[in-house]
Amino acid sequence: MRLFLAIDIPENIKEEIAKFQEQFKMKGIKLVEKENLHITVKFLGEVDEEKLKEILNLDLSIQPIKIKLKYIGTFPNSNYIRVIWIGAYNNNLVEIFKEIDEKLSNLGFKKEREYVPHLTIGRVKFIDNKKKLKDRIEKYKDVDFGEFEAKHIKLYKSTLTPNGPIYEVIKEW
């Protein structure tokens, strides 16, 4: 099964982001469904039942932290856009990631090189009008969705369908 760890976003902020995503409704861009908006902590990929049991036995709980959601960014860079995201800011987020990454590496998962806390709002399949997209990103680069308190890390199962992924919570720490 395909798994990832994430921090949920409060419903009111999801609503705001869903309205904001309208600015990026363009040919070639697949927007993330409102119910699927989250901050990915770590993508685990395909995991078998045995490894899942090991993950479920880990303590991945976190202390409550305030996370600011602001600014627009892109991966891998502004000249070759594949992902459009909103930044997630709190100095402890990177530390939380490192702790979780370390615990998972002990189970055989590959360590990540660098963690950029973010919330993906869209994936670019192809760009019909690169200038229009870059102008839109520039126009909204300082967007601010405020902050919220994160109290949990959730383990999600992701089932890919022709209509997009379906996420199911397996465990909450």
Swiss-Prot record:
Protein keywords: Hydrolase
Sequence motif HXTX 1, residues: 38-41
GO MF: 2',3'-cyclic-nucleotide 3'-phosphodiesterase activity; protein kinase A regulatory subunit binding; RNA 2',3'-cyclic 3'-phosphodiesterase activity
Positions of short motif HXTX 2: 118-121
SUPFAM superfamilies found in the cross-reference section: LigT-like
Record: active site: H38, H118
GO terms for cellular component: cytosol
Catalytic reaction equation(s): a 3'-end 2',3'-cyclophospho-ribonucleotide-RNA + H2O = a 3'-end 2'-phospho-ribonucleotide-RNA + H(+)
EC numbers, comma separated: 3.1.4.58
Claim: Lipid metabolism is one of the keywords in the record: no
Role noted for this protein: Hydrolyzes RNA 2',3'-cyclic phosphodiester to an RNA 2'-phosphomonoester.
Family: Belongs to the 2H phosphoesterase superfamily. ThpR family.
HAMAP family: RNA_CPDase (MF_01940)
Protein name, entry field: RNA 2',3'-cyclic phosphodiesterase
Organism: Methanocaldococcus jannaschii (strain ATCC 43067 / DSM 2661 / JAL-1 / JCM 10045 / NBRC 100440)
The organism's taxonomic lineage, starting at the top: Archaea, Methanobacteriati, Methanobacteriota, Methanomada group, Methanococci
